[in-house]
């Protein structure tokens, strides 16, 4: 059953049961003091409201029959998946650079199985959800995401998570190139960097690549009364 979500730059209509809510990298690394972003010098002090908003969005999406996909960014314990000096990721990943500057952190940042890699305690995938590891910023790179979505007839993706200007935007952009409709819930995302970075990422998304809404509006669009209005 179709519903319409109020968004910028215009409303967008979608079928929740042919849509997915994507939770990007809500790991200790990105959202918890003592995690990678914090150790690399980024401010994570305002991530708690984002976690609560994601909980709300996930609950509403699951009740409406949306597929929930959780991403975890990181690599194997030996960092083979991160790429060596021949990979730009080796030179640009702030996690890898932080470990090179602080050797005592080697093996602790974004390594599979580590505390840093784990999802935050408040966000727990449920049976029927899909959890995918990803080795780069985009959730489409070297993952089965595209195949999972296409096999289910899913064309609309609603994004939450961290960081708005890095992995969220990268995944939404790649989805745009693959003909997916991408929506970001702005109060369920958080940037890596100053506040203007969040605004710039959202401007890019709503102007060139997708749509921007918020959690309260999203939940309202999934309420039974909204479906009744469309019907």
Swiss-Prot record:
It is an enzyme of class 3 (hydrolase). InterPro entries: Isochorismatase-like_dom, Isochorismatase-like_hydrls, Isochorismatase-like_sf, RutB. GO terms for biological process: nitrogen utilization; uracil catabolic process. The active site is at residues 25, 134, 167. It catalyses: (Z)-3-ureidoacrylate + H2O + H(+) = (Z)-3-aminoacrylate + NH4(+) + CO2; (Z)-3-ureidoacrylate + H2O = (Z)-3-aminoacrylate + carbamate + H(+); (Z)-2-methylureidoacrylate + H2O + H(+) = (Z)-2-methylaminoacrylate + NH4(+) + CO2. Induction: Up-regulated by the nitrogen regulatory protein C (NtrC also called GlnG) and repressed by RutR. The keyword Ribosomal protein does not apply. CDD domains: cysteine_hydrolases. One of its GO terms (molecular function) is hydrolase activity, acting on carbon-nitrogen (but not peptide) bonds, in linear amides. Keywords: Hydrolase. Its EC number is 3.5.1.110. Hydrolyzes ureidoacrylate to form aminoacrylate and carbamate. The carbamate hydrolyzes spontaneously, thereby releasing one of the nitrogen atoms of the pyrimidine ring as ammonia and one of its carbon atoms as CO2. Belongs to the isochorismatase family. RutB subfamily. This is Ureidoacrylate amidohydrolase RutB. It comes from Escherichia coli O139:H28 (strain E24377A / ETEC).
